[in-house]
């Protein structure tokens, strides 16, 4: 069964003074709790041919535990959000806006300071087409410059701040099984939100009675505290763990062009063109030397790597260059990569 309780409270304010000043504000609070309970039962001894069920007698208690008749699981999470937005416009030409958001979740570290993340954004717009020195330009309907900056947060639901283990029955000696819990993930009391800081600058243009509209956006996104693999010393008992420490940068441009080609009472023809370019780079990451996923430091995410060929040897086997620029066979290269991964 899935259950959820949500409590929301919202307030809005809007006012206009002397056709010059416009003020808008909004506040909202949301508290949500979800829980999931699963119960399953299994039966043994059913014969599909006779459509009858025969009792199954296990030779001992250990064997019976390998085939449980009843399973139950329970998951519970809580979220809280508090946010507000506001904007001020002067003479319908200059607009300043901002927002503040405070999100919290019990999915993060034991320390309370990691459970909440303050988010914010600021933005501005200058509508040049309404300026007196451009107002008389008949072919220009809209020309606006805008910019924004803000920070966003993300939850990785595949991680946990607590010790994770697998309960299982293992065979120690022939005919004998033991119950055990295998620890698969070490605890992480500092697990926290993934953060992304975004700066965007854009321009909007509309001409010829808005028959042609153009929007261009340039953006830079710097992501930090990303959940990524960090190698650990062997003394810890784990080879690696997922922690907040990787960083990534995205830069790009997005262009949108819309045209109204024909517009009559019986027929309308409009076209839209979109172009987007994005370039990303892993700024901080740590993975074994012989791995390339999810991304190597200094390269784009999902970059494709290839070995530099050095031709073939006298017997026709391929040769490759190692890091020192020496020619090695494929077998030698694999041994070097394996040694580098273990080191």
PLM feature spans:
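Terminal low-complexity, poorly structured segments
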Residues: 53, 136, 315, 330-332
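Extracellular/periplasmic, surface-exposed regions of secreted and cell-surface proteins
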Residues: 1-309
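Short linear proline/tyrosine/threonine-rich motifs used for host-factor recruitment
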Residues: 318-320, 327-329
């Amino acid at each position: 069964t899935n259950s959820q309780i949500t409590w929301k409270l919202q307030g809005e304010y809007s006012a206009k003074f002397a056709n010059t000043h416009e003020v808008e504000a909004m506040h909202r609070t949301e508290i949500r709790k979800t829980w999931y309970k699963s119960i399953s039962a299994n039966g043994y001894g059913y014969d599909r041919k006779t459509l009858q069920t025969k009792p199954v007698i296990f030779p001992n208690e250990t064997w019976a535990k390998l085939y449980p008749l009843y399973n139950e699981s329970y998951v519970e999470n809580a979220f809280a959000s508090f946010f507000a937005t506001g904007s001020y416009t002067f003479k319908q030409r200059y607009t300043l806006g901002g927002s503040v958001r405070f999100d919290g979740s019990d999915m993060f570290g034991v320390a309370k300071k990691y459970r909440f993340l303050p988010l914010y954004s600021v933005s501005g717009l200058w509508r040049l087409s309404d300026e007196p020195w451009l107002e008389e330009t008949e072919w220009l309907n809209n020309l606006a410059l805008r910019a924004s900056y803000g920070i966003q947060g993300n939850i990785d639901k595949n991680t946990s701040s607590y010790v994770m283990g697998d309960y299982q029955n293992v065979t120690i000696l022939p005919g004998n099984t033991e119950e055990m819990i295998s620890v698969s993930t070490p605890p992480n009391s500092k697990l926290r939100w993934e953060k992304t800081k975004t700066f965007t600058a854009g321009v909007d243009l509309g001409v010829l009675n808005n028959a042609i509209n153009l929007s261009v956006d340039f953006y830079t996104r710097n992501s930090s505290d990303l959940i990524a693999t960090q190698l650990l010393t062997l003394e810890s008992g784990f080879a690696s763990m997922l922690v907040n420490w990787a960083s990534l940068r995205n830069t790009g441009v997005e262009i949108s062009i819309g045209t109204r080609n024909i517009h009559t009472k019986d027929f309308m023809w409009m076209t839209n063109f979109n172009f987007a370019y994005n370039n990303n780079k892993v700024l901080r990451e740590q993975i074994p030397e012989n791995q390339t996923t999810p991304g190597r430091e200094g390269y784009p995410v999902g970059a494709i790597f290839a070995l530099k060929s050095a031709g073939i040897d006298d017997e026709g086997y391929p040769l490759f260059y190692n890091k020192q620029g020496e020619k090695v066979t494929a077998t030698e290269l694999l041994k070097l990569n394996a040694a580098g991964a273990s080191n």
